[in-house]
């Protein structure tokens, strides 16, 4: 501020005087500003296993439904932020499985590139508020112990980087086969890998494959693992596997273990032939009756019956029914998706835009149950990576709030905003000048 000079005449007679100075001080008001957490969890929150059921954070049984990728070394281009967002909004998908093969040009021969593909998919799922299965896709290697050291190192790294996110699910061995058995091979492998993950991530779900291409869940049920939040996978293809495999699942669940069908197809076990929609419907109805979560094989345009997309389809979503195969149409309907998905309602602000003379509190609400509000307070456009609204926002200075609503199975709302100007909040402070005594005239300079 500028200096103000004032000449003050003093008479020879000694006297005292008091100078009152009023000045405006710009101060920052209270520092208890609301801090939001990032969007790190899907609609069910922290998953857990209760008895034979996968449950949400409140202990309520939940059924996840979604898509599995094909091998990432071949069809990773179909699994990206845009395609996953489309599946979430248009089909109602809430889980994605990233199938990272060990052999056939997969992780063992190309660890760095395959790991980067997995990381991109996992981060996209987190940003989209979806669950994601990290699949160690053993197949031609038959026995999970073949690469158990690489598996341990890989899952430790995944747990270190993503274990804090409840979106993440670990699948530690896709389809043990070729004479590999539960007691001598798979269970010892699981007892080696699971503690390595649990030392870093104590809570997220771990899924374990079973013998005979993950069909022998009944054998695992008679000799289960002794850890919490463990599930066992059963894989089926409708043209090959029918009631006898459902009987195995019924038995396993009656023994108290939880099942997650991380891979199933409308085709026969080769991935081609069919699709067999009548038997597929029996399976879909069965899984719904048991609250068994599932991911369908496969999100790709490969020329085989189990592929969801026709050859040459877009890799970034936006698919209409004409882009889908017979299998893709069936699976979309089974998940609950529609190409006429409604839009969720925009959030409502408790306080209108305007000028206020003191700090204000703003509440954001949505008329859609189970929806999530993302917002910003710096004037930037909010995205699904922006903070999730969980409690009132304190406005202590001029602020632009922008927000939108998301809900699984619906398209995102329009972005709404409000501008709040806070004025006259700077306190006026009265400062007393010192007392002076002179016996002759002086000039005093006051600096404000």
Swiss-Prot record:
Superkingdom, taxonomy of origin: Bacteria
Positions annotated to bind substrate: 70, 74-75, 101, 137, 237, 269-270, 297, 302-304
Assigned EC number: 3.2.1.4
UniProt keyword annotation of Transcription present: no
One Pfam family in the UniProt entry: CHB_HEX_C_1
Catalysed transformations (reactions): Endohydrolysis of (1->4)-beta-D-glucosidic linkages in cellulose, lichenin and cereal beta-D-glucans
GO MF terms, alphabetically ordered: cellulase activity
Keywords annotated in UniProt: Carbohydrate metabolism, Cellulose degradation, Glycosidase, Hydrolase, Polysaccharide degradation, Signal
Signal peptide bounds: 1-34
InterPro entries: Glyco_hydro_5, Glyco_hydro_5_CS, Glycoside_hydrolase_SF
Active site: 175, 263
One GO BP: cellulose catabolic process
Enzyme class: hydrolase
Note: The C-terminal region of C.acetobutylicum is not required for activity.
Similarity comment: family membership: Belongs to the glycosyl hydrolase 5 (cellulase A) family.
Protein name: Endoglucanase
Organism annotation: Clostridium saccharobutylicum
């Amino acid at each position: 501020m500028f200096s103000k000079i004032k000449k003050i005449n003093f008479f020879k007679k000694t006297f005292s005087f008091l100078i009152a100075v009023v000045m405006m001080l710009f101060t920052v008001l209270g520092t208890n500003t609301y801090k939001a957490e990032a969007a790190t969890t899907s609609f069910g929150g922290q998953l857990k296993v209760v008895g034979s059921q996968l449950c949400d954070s409140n202990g309520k049984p939940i059924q996840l439904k979604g898509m599995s990728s094909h091998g990432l070394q071949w069809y990773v281009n179909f699994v990206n932020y845009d395609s996953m967002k489309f599946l979430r909004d248009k089909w109602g998908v809430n889980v994605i499985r990233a199938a990272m093969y060990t052999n056939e040009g997969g992780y063992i021969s190309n660890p760095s590139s395959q790991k980067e593909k997995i990381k991109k998919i996992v981060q996209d799922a987190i940003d989209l508020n979806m669950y994601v299965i990290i699949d160690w896709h053993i197949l031609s290697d038959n026995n999970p112990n073949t690469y158990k050291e690489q598996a341990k190192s890989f899952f430790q790294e995944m747990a270190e980087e993503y274990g804090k996110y409840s979106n993440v699910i670990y699948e530690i061995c896709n389809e043990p086969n070729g004479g590999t058995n539960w007691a001598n091979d798979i269970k010892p492998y699981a007892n080696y890998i699971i503690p390595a993950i649990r030392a870093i991530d104590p809570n997220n779900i771990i899924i374990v494959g079973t013998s005979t291409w993950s069909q022998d869940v009944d054998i695992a049920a008679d000799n289960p693992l002794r850890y919490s939040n463990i599930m066992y996978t059963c894989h089926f293809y409708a043209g090959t596997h029918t009631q006898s495999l459902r009987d195995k699942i019924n038995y396993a669940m009656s023994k108290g273990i939880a099942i997650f069908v991380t891979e199933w197809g409308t085709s026969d076990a080769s991935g081609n032939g069919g699709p067999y929609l009548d038997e597929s419907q029996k399976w879909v109805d069965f899984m719904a009756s048991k609250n068994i979560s599932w991911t369908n094989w496969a999100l790709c345009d490969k020329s085989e019956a189990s592929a969801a997309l026709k050859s040459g389809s877009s890799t970034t979503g936006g698919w209409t029914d004409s882009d889908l195969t017979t299998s893709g149409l069936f699976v979309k309907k089974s998940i609950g998706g529609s190409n006429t998905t409604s839009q969720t309602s925009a959030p409502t602000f408790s306080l209108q835009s305007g000028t206020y003379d003191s700090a204000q509190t703003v509440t954001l609400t949505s008329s859609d149950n189970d929806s999530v509000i993302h917002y910003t307070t710096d004037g930037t456009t909010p995205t699904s990576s922006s903070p999730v609204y969980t409690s009132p926002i304190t406005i202590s200075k001029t602020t632009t709030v922008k927000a939108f609503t998301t809900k699984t199975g619906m398209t995102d709302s329009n972005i709404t905003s409000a501008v709040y100007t806070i004025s006259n909040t700077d306190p006026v402070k009265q400062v007393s000048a010192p007392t002076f005594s002179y016996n002759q005239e002086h000039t005093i300079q006051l600096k404000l």
